[in-house]
Amino acid sequence: MRINPGEITKVLEEKIKSFEEKIDLEDTGKVIQVGDGIARAYGLNKVMVSELVEFVETGVKGVAFNLEEDNVGIIILGEYKDIKEGHTVRRLKRIIEVPVGEELLGRVVNPLGEPLDGKGPINAKNFRPIEIKAPGVIYRKPVDTPLQTGIKAIDSMIPIGRGQRELIIGDRQTGKTAIAIDTIINQKGQGVYCIYVAIGQKKSAIARIIDKLRQYGAMEYTTVVVASASDPASLQYIAPYAGCAMGEYFAYSGRDALVVYDDLSKHAVAYRQLSLLMRRPPGREAYPGDIFYLHSRLLERAVRLNDKLGGGSLTALPIVETQANDISAYIPTNVISITDGQIYLEPGLFYAGQRPAINVGLSVSRVGGSAQIKAMKQVAGMLRIDLAQYRELETFAQFATELDPATRAQIIRGQRLMELLKQEQYSPMPVEEQVVVLFAGVRGYLDDLPVEEVRRFEKEFLRFMHEKHQDILDDIKTKKELTSETEEKLKKAIEEFKTTFRV
């Protein structure tokens, strides 16, 4: 049999002409550009915004971020160095989910829920999408239970309730993280599960925080979510949503959870980086137009659920860093307007030795007051007034030579109360102890003491109360109010102690 080469060529040409390439452009695509943690892909015609995609050759995941006419912008969740032009991307037809549940307690994970602590895999039984719609008004109930921070200045004048969103704001190195960590340590035995989300921080700083939480036994009920400064912007962007989903698991199963976002300034910077790389139009301070929505959809998920949904709560403590005390910058004003109050820390107070450096005049809690225990309300009302008057007179007193006795008494009281509000780091105080020491302050029992003796008085007085008058502390703890009977006992106890206290 003779083979005619011309005939074979003709057949091949016809076959090639009639060949139709069946590429599935609906569920797959090809990478046309990659770099700086983002990729652009051709195809993926049916992909939805925020949908999870996978780079087939490397197994790395990404999120569809920009849907454009001729391509899809993808943020890469992990190492992008091995992804090359021409690689295949496929839809996964779901959004990012993270493992949730008790299995994560005591663990350090990345924003995808993968362990970073070398303690083996996390065998979680439950998963939750990182983005959900915040529950509406009818699914919520008013904030009515206190979340004790153990910090006198906060629990007395800026009280936080379970289900509240309270912003901690201030310049760098003013003690913002310290307040959040103290609050987590103080939840020991309170039935509150804690999630600490570290965004864009140095790994050494995060390691120090984890070490402190371990040291004080707080890791038993805490999960740490880490997206450090060396992680891609994409992971820093999803970190708070992942932490929120982990906290929501407890809230929706009728328990109480606390999430600390440390900090949302770096979160906004990571989102700005991704948006600019994706060529989204920049707005004020080069942030994209939807930067407000970025934080509002996160913080609206803090909730106090009604009894029908189990009555659980998710409390949020976002942290925002200011530059040179400027709380009127873009991100600070955004987050202030979203949250239910703010704790404002001032470098001036910090360097003057007033720690925690809380500016009580500019700090406010818009809903926590209704969650405060009655005993604390009874002493805190006077405290707030005394300090407000002291702040007014303080500047005036520096210039005035002669002061009338009433003004002098007000300044003396204010100085002692400011001293009383100082507190060591990592030493949160139970609410009943706070009530008795603040009672001594606002009722003038410290007015005749030198300012430098106030801290020693507080320490020895509490020891005396535990040794001789534990019944008063127990009474405040159980009844949650200062009855006239308890008040009389407390006055007698303070007077008794003052006879033995030597200056």
UniProtKB/Swiss-Prot annotation:
Annotated keywords: ATP synthesis, ATP-binding, Cell inner membrane, Cell membrane, CF(1), Hydrogen ion transport, Ion transport, Membrane, Nucleotide-binding, Translocase, Transport
Entries under NCBIfam families matching the protein: atpA (TIGR00962), PRK13343.1 (NF009884)
Annotated GO CC locations: plasma membrane; proton-transporting ATP synthase complex
Catalytic activity reported: ATP + H2O + 4 H(+)(in) = ADP + phosphate + 5 H(+)(out)
InterPro entries in alphabetical order: ATP_synth_asu-like_sf, ATP_synth_asu_C, ATP_synth_asu_C_sf, ATP_synth_F1_a_nt-bd_dom, ATP_synth_F1_asu, ATPase_a/bsu_AS, ATPase_F1/V1/A1_a/bsu_N, ATPase_F1/V1/A1_a/bsu_N_sf
Gene encoding the protein: atpA
Family note: Belongs to the ATPase alpha/beta chains family.
Role according to the record: Produces ATP from ADP in the presence of a proton gradient across the membrane. The alpha chain is a regulatory subunit.
Gene Ontology annotations of biological process type: proton motive force-driven ATP synthesis
Name of the protein this chain belongs to: ATP synthase subunit alpha
Signal sequence extent: none
Pfam family, one: ATP-synt_ab_N
Keyword ATP-binding: yes
Bilayer disposition of the protein: Peripheral membrane protein
